[in-house]
Amino acid sequence: MLTIALSKGRILDDTLPLLAEAGIVPTENPDKSRKLIIPTTQDDVRLLIVRATDVPTYVEHGAADLGVAGKDVLMEYGGQGLYEPLDLQIARCKLMTAGVVGAPEPKGRLRVATKFVNVAKRYYAEQGRQVDIIKLYGSMELAPLINLADKIIDVVDTGNTLRANGLEPQDLIATISSRLVVNKASMKMQHARIQSLIDTLRQAVESRHRG
């Protein structure tokens, strides 16, 4: 049995057509189903529907053989115990710093609000900048507006939400897309099956990219 961990939302919507190219189609709509384990048209493949931030954990611990996770999630929650054989080139966005439009660069210790605490620590450590990291789980744009933080670090797609709140994207930390990740033990135990799936998905990605 091959188990693939996915999260609902944009990643799921963009991944399903790629899996379909490999003949893997869920037997019911994951967006509408309440089930968290969904069979597919291939008897030996099932989907696990989990939180986006939990995908690396399920795969690393072997509860899933493969998964699809954003590079931002892998950077924050760790992808060290996983193989990352393929960039699926879906759910693309940017991980950036942002601040109030026209605000001067703060001097001294910087206050940064983000849910990407580990990424923020590494980023500013590399710059030699002293920072106080304030962990938030949402509505990052609010933090600079009410003087909770000087800057935020967040995923930026169009930038419209930032601009609507008087903020502007500033420094690019990483370009983000969704990656296929594989459990290391599974890759050894089911190498032929998993490699075949990786190759098929790679062809689908390349074909879509050329088109």
Curated annotation (Swiss-Prot):
Which PROSITE patterns does this UniProt record tie to the protein?
ATP_P_PHORIBOSYLTR (PS01316)
Instruction: Print the keywords alphabetically.
Output: Amino-acid biosynthesis, ATP-binding, Cytoplasm, Glycosyltransferase, Histidine biosynthesis, Nucleotide-binding, Transferase
According to its UniProt record, this protein's enzyme class is transferase
* Keyword flag Membrane: no
* GO CC terms in record: cytoplasm
Q: Where in the cell is it found?
A: Cytoplasm
- Identify the Gene3D superfamilies for this entry: Periplasmic binding protein-like II
Per the record, the pathway is: Amino-acid biosynthesis; L-histidine biosynthesis; L-histidine from 5-phospho-alpha-D-ribose 1-diphosphate: step 1/9
Short name of any one Pfam family annotated for the protein? HisG
- Reaction equations catalysed: 1-(5-phospho-beta-D-ribosyl)-ATP + diphosphate = 5-phospho-alpha-D-ribose 1-diphosphate + ATP
Enzyme Commission identifier(s): 2.4.2.17
The GO biological-process annotations, alphabetized, read as:
L-histidine biosynthetic process
- Please list the GO terms describing molecular function: ATP binding; ATP phosphoribosyltransferase activity
The answer, when asked if Glycosyltransferase is one of the entry's keywords, is: yes
PANTHER family annotated for this entry? Answer: ATP PHOSPHORIBOSYLTRANSFERASE, ATP PHOSPHORIBOSYLTRANSFERASE ATP-PRTASE
Quote the record's domain comment. Lacks the C-terminal regulatory region which is replaced by HisZ.
Oligomeric and partner information: Heteromultimer composed of HisG and HisZ subunits.
Physiological role = Catalyzes the condensation of ATP and 5-phosphoribose 1-diphosphate to form N'-(5'-phosphoribosyl)-ATP (PR-ATP). Has a crucial role in the pathway because the rate of histidine biosynthesis seems to be controlled primarily by regulation of HisG enzymatic activity.
The similarity annotation says: Belongs to the ATP phosphoribosyltransferase family. Short subfamily.
User: By its UniProt entry, which NCBIfam families does this protein fall under?
Assistant: hisG
Q: What is this protein called?
A: ATP phosphoribosyltransferase
